[in-house]
């Protein structure tokens, strides 16, 4: 079974927890470290329950707290090369420390985190290399779509087979 819960959605910050089995991932983290910890606590979770952070794109409402959270808790950060390139310049001397936590991903190339199979897929948006995700576990599929400039045939094709 796949479980999910929003930590928040809007211009002040975005974050979504997706879990299957004992593993959970955080998609985007647009909140401060303390804010993220509090939001997770409301779900009965802590950052120690997370296996990884996945990043959709480099806009601050999705990225603001990613690298602070990742460094504090030693979490790998999965993001596209384009997103890393856009984010790297904002790290002001911390890029080398953060780079070690980064795991490059490509749109339409599945990877596994815990019990979740993750499929990033490209979407139109005003960012370098934005993606959204389909999560699979135990024969079920959950699609997520947040910032998307327009619904394309590709987006429809990717999300149509999803259960939710």
Predicted regions and their residues:
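Short, hinge-like loop/turn segments at secondary-structure boundaries
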Residues: 44-45, 94-99, 162
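Short amphipathic alpha-helix with an adjacent loop that forms part of the alpha/beta core around
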Residues: 40-44, 111-115, 155-158
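Active-site environment of divalent metal-dependent phosphoester hydrolases
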Residues: 59-63, 85-86, 127-128, 150-153
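Conserved Rossmann-like nucleotide-binding pocket used by diverse enzymes
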Residues: 54, 119, 144
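Conserved beta-strand hairpin/beta-sheet module of binuclear metal-dependent hydrolase folds
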Residues: 1-43, 129-147, 164
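Active-site metal-binding motif and surrounding structural segment of the metallo-beta-lactamase
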Residues: 33-80, 164
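Metallo-beta-lactamase
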Residues: 81-131, 136-139
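Cap/insert and terminal regions of metallo-dependent hydrolase folds
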Residues: 152-164
């Amino acid at each position: 079974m796949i479980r999910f819960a929003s930590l928040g959605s809007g211009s002040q910050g975005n974050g979504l927890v997706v879990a299957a089995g004992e593993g959970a991932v955080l998609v985007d983290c647009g909140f401060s470290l303390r804010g993220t910890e509090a939001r997770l606590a409301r779900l009965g979770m802590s950052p120690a329950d997370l296996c990884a952070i996945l990043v959709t794109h480099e806009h601050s409402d999705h990225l603001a707290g990613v690298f602070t959270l990742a460094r504090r808790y030693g979490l790998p950060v999965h993001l596209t090369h384009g997103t890393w390139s856009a984010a790297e310049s904002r790290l002001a001397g911390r890029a080398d420390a953060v780079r070690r936590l980064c795991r490059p991903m490509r749109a339409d190339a599945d990877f596994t985190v815990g019990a979740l199979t993750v499929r990033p897929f490209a979407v139109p948006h005003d960012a370098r290399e934005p993606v959204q995700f389909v999560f699979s576990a135990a024969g079920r599929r959950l699609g997520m779509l947040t910032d998307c400039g327009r619904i394309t045939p590709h987006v429809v094709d990717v999300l149509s087979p999803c259960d939710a």
